[in-house]
Amino acid sequence: MNNQNNPIANNLRSLRNRNNWSLEYVAERLEVSRQAVAKWENGDSLPDVMKCDALASLYDV
């Protein structure tokens, strides 16, 4: 799936890049795999509700 049409994927990647964080760093903080974070950012899957809350806290949004 192309993330250009997925605002959630776009926002997740933008927030991570804005903070200069690696996929590995975000994955470690959220206790998920690097592949899971990449899938969220590519629009291939969505984080569950608990991970959405953790993402909001991590990115302070």
PLM region descriptions:
Residues N20-K39, A54:
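Short alpha-helical DNA-recognition segment
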Residues N10, N20-W21, P47-M50:
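Residue-level signal for the short linker/turn that defines the boundary of a DNA-recognition helix
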Residues M50-V61:
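DNA major-groove recognition helix of helix-turn-helix/homeodomain DNA-binding modules
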Residues N42:
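Short, conserved catalytic or interaction motifs in soluble domains
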